[in-house]
Regions:
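Fold-core signature of tandem repeat domains
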Residues: 294, 303, 317-319, 324, ...
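Short, 15-30-residue, compositionally biased linear elements
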Residues: 2-3, 309, 348
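Feature for extracytoplasmic/surface-facing segments of secreted or surface-associated proteins
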Residues: 18-299, 304-315, 320-334, 338-341, ...
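Sec-dependent signal peptide recognition
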Residues: 2-10
């Protein structure tokens, strides 16, 4: 027989230490005892196989996955559980459940995992949880989102007139929003870092950001602190940790580290494609630095890091091709330039004393003489050429630099071989030269 489910304050003891009871609030549908709320009907689960994937990066083969029974009235653990093992490289598991007295269960994954930041197996084990309703599903993935949302979900159930589904949806959306991510990605229990959609990209981005360069112990503490922070109000208030993550993300992105993370995942050969997680990682530090989105209208805009607590607080960034990059003199000077002619030289737009030369299809830094002498740039193609500079002196292009030419170099530049003993006056001076054979 179906019966109404009552959830008490003791629910939170599943995941965290219990505190003092809050005042009870009115609930639609009738009065309740102190600390209890009315929820949906209880459904017994019998002879059901629960399968899915367990991922931070993917948990490695041999890691354990446990389906723990929760009592229907309080969501307290009954002590009954069913255990399985990770049996695939992608973190796949399957657990045969004989009987659960309610549809609510807690999945626990524990073991080593592949770290997407290093590309290697973790040195220590970690534990992730997923709180789930099995009444209409047999597929449950355990991942960072399911782990981060479960304490917040339980708080919402205790303090609001919400169904489990609505509580979990709200918790998930709050977590995504704390990382600056908006979107309807479906349930966290259906997300997979090896998918191709935005939900998969968001999950992988959050996994990457929270991992950063931390070892497993510090990583687990960061997860616990985050869950505790958002439990009561759904807001992540720890600006110090947010800034630390943003600094790691900025340094990693600017040095090409996101491409390395992508390659790490590709090298695992567990999926044909890697979701576009980079956009969410970059968006996180852009917003933390108060840069905003780099749009077409903002192309070439230079803006300083707006986070005074950041380790990169003095750095300037420039909006180029949809991304914020470090604003070097070169980028500020040349970002609006089109291709030039081979050897063309010009001074910078921002720092007008900087000289640049167009060589082999691109602008490069150059010596001041490449601009000031008005001889164009001394490029590899011009090696050995001689010309008269704007200062009326003669110069020769040698090793990408204009050097003052010797009397013989400026007098004989361009001469062809002659007959043995031929005499000729220099082109610039009155010096006379005798041809005495090929050199």
């Amino acid at each position: 027989m179906n019966k109404l489910l009552k959830l008490s304050l003791s629910t939170a003891c599943i995941f965290a230490a219990c505190g003092d009871s809050d005042k009870d609030s009115g609930v639609a549908g009738g009065s309740v005892e102190d600390g209890e709320i009315i929820a949906e009907e209880i459904v017994t689960i019998e002879n059901k196989t629960i399968s899915g994937v367990s991922q931070k990066g993917p948990f490695v083969e041999g890691a354990s996955v446990t389906v723990q029974e929760l009592e229907g009235k309080t969501l307290a653990q009954t002590g009954r559980s069913y255990e399985g093992k990770i049996k695939g490289d992608r973190g796949e598991f399957s657990v045969d459940v004989i009987n659960l007295e309610s549809q609510f269960a807690l999945l626990k994954a524990n073991g080593f995992y592949l770290n997407e930041v290093t590309g290697k197996e973790s040195e220590s084990q970690v534990t992730l949880y997923a709180f789930t309703d099995l009444s209409n599903r047999s597929q449950v993935n355990v991942n960072l989102l399911t782990h981060l949302e479960h304490e917040r979900s339980l708080y919402l159930l205790k303090n609001n007139d919400l169904t489990v589904k609505k509580a979990k949806e709200q918790a998930e959306n709050e977590i995504l929003a704390s990382f600056g991510i908006q979107g309807d990605f479906g349930s966290s229990e259906d997300m997979n870092i090896f998918g191709t959609g935005d939900g998969s990209a968001a999950l992988l981005a959050i996994s990457t950001l929270m991992q950063s360069d931390l070892k497993e112990g510090a990583f687990s503490k960061r997860l616990a602190d985050y869950a505790s922070d958002i439990e009561a109000d759904g807001v992540w208030d720890n600006e110090k940790v947010q800034t630390a993550i943003a600094d790691w993300a900025a340094k990693t992105s600017l040095k090409g580290g996101l491409a390395s993370i992508r390659k790490n995942i590709e090298d695992w050969e567990l999926s044909d494609k890697v979701p576009a997680f980079e956009k969410y990682v970059n968006s996180f530090w852009w917003e933390n630095y108060k840069l905003g989105t780099c749009t077409t209208k903002r192309e070439g805009e230079v803006k300083k890091n707006g986070n005074s607590s950041s380790a990169l607080k003095d750095m300037e960034f420039i909006c180029l091709d949809g991304a914020w990059l470090e604003a070097t003199d070169f980028s500020k000077d040349t970002h609006s330039w089109k291709a030039g002619k081979e050897g063309e030289s010009r001074y910078g737009d921002s720092v007008t004393t900087n000289c640049y030369v167009f060589e082999e299809g691109a602008w490069r830094d150059a010596n001041d003489s490449d601009c000031s002498l008005e001889l164009d740039g001394c490029t590899e193609a011009k090696e050995g050429t001689v010309g008269k500079g704007s200062d009326k002196s003669w110069y020769i292009c040698r090793d990408n630099s204009w050097e003052e030419a010797s009397t013989m170099e400026k007098d004989t530049y361009g001469w062809k071989d002659a007959a043995e003993g031929d005499i000729k006056k220099g082109d610039v001076t009155d010096t006379v030269y005798v041809f005495n054979g090929k050199k």
